[in-house]
Curated annotation (Swiss-Prot):
HAMAP family: UreE. The gene is ureE. Residues 211-230 have a biased composition (Basic and acidic residues). The lineage of its organism: Bacteria, Pseudomonadati, Pseudomonadota, Gammaproteobacteria, Enterobacterales. It comes from Yersinia enterocolitica. Keywords: Chaperone, Cytoplasm, Nickel, Nickel insertion, Virulence. This is Urease accessory protein UreE. InterPro entries: UreE, UreE_N, UreE_N_sf.
Amino acid sequence: MILIEHILGNVKKDPVWQEKLKDATFDLLVLDQREAQKSRCRKLSTQGLDLGISLDRHVVLADGDVLAWDEKTNVAVVVQINLRDVMVIDLSELKSRSPDELIKTCFELGHALGNQHWKAVTKNNEVYVPLTVATTMMDSVMRTHGFQHLPFRFVKGAEILPLLSNSEARLLFGGAEDTDTHVHVASPLDEPHGSGLHVHAIHSHGTGHTHSHDHDHSHSHGDHDHDHKH
């Protein structure tokens, strides 16, 4: 087993490594988005290398990370992460609306996403939602809740990943299939350039299903209260 304790660089983001590996052969370590969130795992590369990943706990692998490089053979072990597709909702149109309309639409959109237990991140005037159901169902939810005026599209997760910070990527792609979640509006002070809408897991139904609720209740989480639509 080859022990990997450090990431050398990233061939997709680092110009230095892009130049170094422009003629290299890539031996890929293929991970799904859940595996990529683990700082420790053991897996074979596509060429059969037995790799033991043992990174610091706060470090997670990203698509394009270089784990090893043999200059003599010009072979590099590079991470390939298979990400879910993402629904991208464009909020730019709201800039022309009145403050009251803007607040109302954002609140209703956050409620609609949270009521479906969908993870989401807002950034660059867009909302990113990883697919956990068929695109036709997500399309139907958007139209049923009256968001036809908000342009939305479906793109590959790899297209969105470079736009995200590490914490946003973990939030969006880390276990996106876990659907027991609710919407949380974060303080701008949490991350200077981060997102304003986060979704965090809150409870397990135990049966692996999602559903909508139709009655209201409020409860406390220690130092703050908030309402949920149930």
